[in-house]
């Protein structure tokens, strides 16, 4: 849209052209927006009627219309969503190799359970071989799971689903989980780094586009998918409304790292809070990339070690009694 606007095309022609290239859902949305624009609606209200776009996106469009910089705003939004897509794609690619290893481990365990364990159990029984305690536990557990697999599998699937439903259906439980995400050792550093990078990026884009600071904080807060952080930012909004500085107000929320507060103070002193959010975003996104790469390097060998321990443990549990029997003979 930004490129086509710069080339001089009208907004309704652009939306119609884009709509004809999208799937049915998006095509209907863009064509409906085109009809509304032709009726005299603003671009924001035309998009809002489709109920497909976020409040963040709609606020940015409104700001672009009012300032006459719609093309610039759309370019910023394009970069924002491209970055968001790259991060999500990277996280998905991270999980492919561990997922493959995990599936291989499950397949190997199932093979041992159905093809190996029953035969060894039969040999032990027919020769009156009493396996060691560890082997006995493994073999008995495997035989039990094999016997009641049709009951155990639905239970193992149902329990997480029920827990998820119970948590989702209760706002208080969701708030506790969201707070735990921010406080849990090891995990909280990565999670808050991600939230801070996202929050600062959203704030920079909105302030750059001319959205007032109070509205920017409100919209940036709504985008965050964490009820605990949203409630803490309500404290910040109250203090901003009272006239407190942005750095002091966000500091009172007690959720963001000290680095963010310090950089905001510097931005207030220099009179360029917008640039401060840009620097904060750059800093935390770089830190996030470094930490993500470290996690990738740790996950792959960790999964391999776990797989080796599980498969190796099963093999030892099966083979050990056989060696004991041969030694006894």
Label each residue range with its predicted role:
Residues 1-100, 178, 182-301:
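Catalytic metal-binding core of the metallo-beta-lactamase
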Residues 56, 133, 140, 172-176, ...:
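Exposed alpha-helical structural elements
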Residues 86-166, 286-329:
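Bilayer-spanning, highly hydrophobic alpha-helical transmembrane segments
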Residues 126-129, 162-184:
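Juxtamembrane helix-loop transition segments at the membrane interface in multi-pass membrane proteins
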Residues 151-172, 208-223:
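Alpha-helical membrane-embedding segments
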Residues 169-172, 222, 254-255, 285, ...:
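Short flexible/disordered coil segments
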């Amino acid at each position: 849209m930004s490129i086509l606007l710069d080339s001089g095309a009208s907004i309704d022609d652009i939306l119609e052209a884009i709509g004809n290239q999208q799937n049915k859902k998006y095509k209907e949305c863009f064509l409906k927006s085109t009809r509304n624009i032709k009726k005299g609606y603003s671009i924001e209200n035309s998009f809002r009627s489709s109920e497909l776009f976020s409040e963040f996106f709609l606020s940015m469009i409104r700001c672009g219309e009012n300032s006459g910089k719609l093309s610039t705003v759309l370019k910023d939004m394009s970069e924002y969503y491209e970055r968001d897509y790259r991060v999500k794609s990277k996280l998905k690619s991270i999980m492919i190799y561990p997922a493959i290893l995990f599936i291989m481990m499950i397949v190997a365990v199932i093979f041992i359970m159905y093809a190996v364990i029953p035969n060894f159990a039969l040999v032990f029984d027919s020769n009156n071989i009493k396996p060691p305690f560890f082997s006995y536990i493994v073999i008995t557990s495997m035989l039990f799971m094999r016997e009641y697999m049709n009951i155990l599998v639905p239970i193992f699937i149902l329990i997480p689903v029920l827990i998820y439903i119970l948590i989702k259906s209760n706002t208080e439980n969701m708030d506790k989980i969201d707070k735990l995400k921010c406080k849990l050792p090891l995990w909280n550093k990565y999670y808050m780094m991600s939230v801070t990078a996202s929050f600062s990026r959203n704030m920079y884009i909105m302030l750059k586009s001319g959205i007032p600071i109070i509205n920017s904080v409100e919209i940036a807060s709504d985008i965050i998918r964490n009820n605990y952080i949203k409630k803490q930012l309500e404290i910040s909004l109250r203090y901003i409304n009272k006239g407190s500085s942005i750095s002091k107000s966000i500091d009172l929320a007690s959720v963001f790292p000290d680095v963010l507060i310090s950089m905001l103070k510097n931005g207030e002193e220099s009179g360029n809070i917008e640039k401060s959010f840009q620097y904060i975003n750059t800093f935390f996104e770089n830190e996030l990339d470094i930490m993500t790469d470290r996690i990738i390097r740790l996950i792959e060998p960790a999964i391999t070690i776990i797989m080796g321990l599980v498969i190796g443990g099963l093999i030892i549990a099966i083979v050990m009694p056989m060696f004991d029997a041969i030694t006894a003979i």
